[in-house]
């Protein structure tokens, strides 16, 4: 490949071509994801590299199996486990979903592409619960995806009417489906009309004004904006999200989800909170009710430490994360910093010098976001190299 332009695709119609997973849906949309294909090629073109799918580590392949097959080191980079669910009444009704599930469904299925038949429905108004970068990313993605979703629905609806007639197309819908379809159709026609007027007046279409009119997207966070992880980790993302029209409702703690006559989410009720002079958060009696046809929970995740429960004789747990060891096999408590003075990423050391390391959301120093995961790899690769120097290679080829 002589020119990188040969690899670049339009981001709106791009087919996933990196390593998938959180590399696709956990990185801000402001980063050119064409680079994911380039990163994969940079690794995959190297002769010693191989990538095998369909293998569940801890099931298909155990730790002992891996070492018996000649692997000199095992690096665990399996990311987060299950998302944190908020234990509130009606917290799992239709319309409520994990933010990571929405992002994964959007990015990995290509739901936003015109030629995709992926079923990913989101309605407005939408409320995102949480204050991290995932919450920010989810809010901006919902705002960007909604117009594409309803316009695609209208295009296919009109195509089917042309082929089969309106009565036939609508015959199979129940009352709720009819209401949702009419909502999407009216919104799509309003967007289409705005685009036509904008073209006639030679100006950009004001799609955001329409989205705002239909309820828009609000982030609800239990503390202040300046306390949120997204602000402390990357305030620029917050600034850009607010510039795109995202609303931020601070000092609100969810208490229940209200439903409509069909059992679908209609509102989210929240308690107001206040910061006291001694630095504690006090829950007030005041209750706020936010309209919400889509409620996306971005309240963090649990580390994916199931392997420690499956093989407890080889991996230990320290609080919620894997137990870390130094290079002499002594248990240590890692420094809670993305740039620790001394890096501790080893989870197991064998007598022959071979070892297991752990990164990203598995590690207390680096858990929480993709930036931390990348930092863990950068900080830890040198230690892996040093450990490999101690071991006679199982295969010199």
Q: Whereabouts are the PLM-identified features?
A:
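A conserved FAD-binding loop/helix module that cradles the flavin
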Residues: 135, 347, 358-391
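Small-residue-rich anion-binding loops in enzyme active sites
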Residues: 53-91
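Redox-cofactor binding/interface segments in oxidoreductases and associated redox assembly factors
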Residues: 74-76, 98, 128, 297
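A Rossmann-like FAD-binding core segment of flavoenzymes
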Residues: 8-19, 30-59, 69, 74, ...
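FAD-site-proximal beta/loop scaffold in flavoenzymes
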Residues: 94-122, 257-261, 277-365
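Cofactor-binding loop segments of dinucleotide-utilizing enzymes, especially the Rossmann-like FAD-
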Residues: 131, 222-224, 361
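Glycine-rich dinucleotide-binding loop and its adjacent helix/turn
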Residues: 83-206, 319-342
């Amino acid at each position: 490949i002589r020119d990188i332009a040969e690899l670049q695709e339009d981001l709106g119609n791009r087919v996933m071509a990196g390593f998938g997973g959180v590399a696709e849906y956990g990185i801000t949309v402001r980063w050119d994801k064409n680079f994911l294909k380039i990163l994969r090629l940079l690794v995959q073109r190297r002769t010693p590299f191989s990538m095998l799918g369909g293998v569940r580590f801890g099931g298909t392949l155990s730790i002992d199996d891996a070492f018996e097959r000649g692997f000199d080191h095992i690096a665990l980079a399996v990311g987060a486990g299950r998302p944190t669910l908020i234990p509130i009444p009606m917290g799992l009704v239709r319309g409520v979903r994990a933010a990571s599930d929405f992002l994964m469904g959007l990015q990995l299925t290509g739901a936003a592409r015109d030629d995709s038949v992926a079923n990913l429905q989101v309605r407005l108004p939408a409320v995102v619960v949480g204050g991290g970068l995932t919450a920010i990313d989810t809010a901006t993605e919902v705002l960007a995806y909604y117009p594409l979703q309803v316009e695609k629905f209208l295009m296919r609806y009109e195509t089917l009417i042309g082929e089969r007639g309106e009565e036939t197309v609508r015959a199979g819908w129940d009352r709720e489906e009819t209401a949702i379809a009419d909502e999407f159709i009216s919104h799509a026609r309003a967007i289409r009309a705005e685009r036509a007027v904008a073209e006639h007046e030679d100006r950009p279409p004001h799609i955001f004004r329409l989205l705002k009119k239909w309820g828009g997207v609000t982030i609800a966070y239990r503390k202040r904006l300046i306390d949120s992880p997204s602000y402390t980790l990357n305030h620029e993302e917050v600034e850009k999200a607010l510039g795109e029209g995202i609303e931020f409702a601070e000092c609100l703690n969810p208490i229940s989800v209200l439903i409509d006559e069909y059992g679908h989410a209609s509102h989210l009720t929240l308690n107001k909170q206040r910061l006291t002079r001694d630095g504690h958060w006090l829950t007030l009696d005041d209750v706020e009710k936010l309209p919400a046809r889509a409620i996306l929970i971005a309240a963090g995740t649990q580390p994916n430490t199931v392997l420690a429960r499956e093989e407890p004789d080889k991996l230990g747990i320290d609080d919620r994360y894997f137990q870390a060891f130094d290079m002499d096999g002594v248990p240590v408590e890692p420094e809670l910093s993305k740039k620790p003075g001394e890096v501790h990423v080893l989870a197991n050391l064998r007598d022959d010098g071979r070892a297991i390391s752990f990164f990203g959301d598995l590690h207390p120093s680096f858990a929480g976001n993709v930036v931390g995961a990348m930092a863990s790899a950068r900080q830890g690769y040198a230690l892996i190299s040093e450990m490999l120097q101690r071991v006679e290679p199982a295969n010199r080829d």
